[in-house]
Amino acid sequence: MAAGNAVKLVLRSRPLAIYAQSGRSFSTSFQPPPNNIYHGQPVYNHIDIGSRKITDAAVARNNDVEAVFVVTGASRSMGLEFVKQLLTRTKGKIVALILRPGSSPALDQALGQLSRDDRARVNVLPLDVTNEDQIVNVATELNETYARVDGLFNVAGVLGDKTTTAGPEMNLSQLDQSWLQHQFAVNAVGPMMSTSKLAPLLKTRKGKKYLRNTGSKESVVVNLSARVASMSDNTGGLAWYSYRMSKAALNQGVRASSHELRRQGTWTIALYPGMTDTDMSKPFQTKMMQEKGLVFPVEFTVSRLLDIVDAMEEENTGGFFDWDGQSIPF
């Protein structure tokens, strides 16, 4: 365990960012910044991705043609990139959940560029993560079609742009009850309800008995969180009340559910992707941030997050980690 009020970790040397996907490598001139320094004491050990470690569980999961990977918020940005990279990193089936099928030009274009075999691996279904009935419908369809889920990626989220939305707030006077409730509905309630309804399909063992003859003995639930959700690390800065609160609630949900999910062979994790070049972050990007390499290409971010998922062990379940595998204090 790391100790101390402030933790500083040594940067693992990476002269060039490499995106490794199923035997293919994509190089870029982008170089990530030095590791973050977090205030507070992490609860979990860090996940080492510097050695390109991949666990036996991940190897089995990724190589299983019957495996099913579910991605919420798959219409664009990171959700869409998860779909793309899961197609190359795994051999299983991908379920892309979006608000309205047929309304995402980016997803439609990406699917149109796939080979016939890869296109057959992708199933696009409607899901509004704030609608419990739709979550139940998705769970029912997945049960009838696949009878299993090996990986759930809760990517759908909302921050706002302060121009067309009531947030993110800069001070208490800007708090809006409807917006606060919407943030919780999308960022905390949605992922937890999705996990709840898909938990029976994620189950891989009963007691010590494994229930599947193929694939890994562990399934995974991956939740996208944010550094600003850390209470220990909150020593000042912008308010962003509703976003911070909703993501902190998600972290607690991940931590609490990890104890129950562990018993059924499911590992769950909260990941901070860093400032990534997405539609959500664009209103808050600056030229200085881009020049200093503080805005990550979406391909880099998703590749790193999948590296962490492939390297995580049971001891990491319930943890909160950043894009480089560092454990973030809650």
Each predicted region: which residue ranges?
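Rossmann-fold cofactor-recognition segment
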Residues: L114-D133
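Non-catalytic terminal and boundary segments that flank Rossmann-like NAD(P)-dependent oxidoreductase
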Residues: A2-V70, K84, K93
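Catalytic loop of short-chain dehydrogenase/reductase
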Residues: V158-V189, A199-R263
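N-terminal Rossmann NAD(P)H-binding glycine-rich loop of SDR-like oxidoreductase domains
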Residues: T72-Q85
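Conserved glycine-rich Rossmann-like NAD(P)H-binding loop of the short-chain dehydrogenase/reductase
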Residues: L87-L107
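Conserved Rossmann-fold cofactor-binding substructure of NAD(P)-dependent oxidoreductases
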Residues: D128-R148
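C-terminal helical subdomain
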Residues: A270, K282, T286-F330
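Short beta-loop-alpha junction of Rossmann-like oxidoreductase domains
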Residues: K162, S230-N234, Y272-Q285
